[in-house]
């Protein structure tokens, strides 16, 4: 375990840090990440030595209770956080509450906005169901 300070200044222990993730990526070391939405799920995940958990920002407090030392990313749901101000507020709420990073499915500019505030942020590359109405099929969002 590594002793770190959260964005909000609380000293905690974490299984990995962003620095570890970068080093592992550079050295082609695979890591594991799963989704958890409840305290019970995160307790199970934590007991299995999964490297990282991803959860919705609304579920983060319960998930953290079940995995106090696991690196957790709080996803900012696109339909809940619409404006840049709402996205920024949601991200700050998550990291001030102890989340290790946030994920957003928004634009590169939004990712950059969060990074410029010192928030560890992941973009999202994946299926975009909302685009299937426009194009008649599911698309990969890059």
Cite the ranges covered by each PLM segment:
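Generic hydrophobic/aromatic pocket-lining and core-packing "Φ" positions
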Residues: 39-42, 60, 84-87, 91, ...
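Acidic/polar active-site rim loop that often engages polyanionic ligands
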Residues: 131-138
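Conserved small/polar residues in nucleotide/adenosyl-binding loops
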Residues: 140-142
């Amino acid at each position: 375990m590594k002793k770190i300070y959260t964005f909000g200044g609380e000293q905690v222990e974490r299984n990995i840090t962003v620095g570890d993730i970068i080093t592992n990526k550079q050295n082609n070391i695979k890591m594991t990440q799963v989704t958890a939405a409840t305290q019970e799920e995160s307790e199970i995940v934590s007991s299995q030595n999964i490297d990282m958990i991803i959860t919705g920002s609304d579920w983060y407090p319960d998930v953290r209770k079940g995995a106090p030392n696991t690196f957790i990313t709080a996803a900012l749901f696109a339909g809940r956080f619409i404006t840049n101000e709402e996205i920024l507020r949601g991200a700050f709420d998550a990291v001030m509450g102890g989340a290790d990073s946030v994920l957003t499915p928004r634009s590169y500019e939004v990712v950059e906005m969060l990074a410029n505030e010192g928030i560890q942020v992941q973009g999202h590359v994946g299926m975009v169901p909302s685009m299937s109405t426009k194009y008649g099929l599911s698309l990969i969002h890059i």
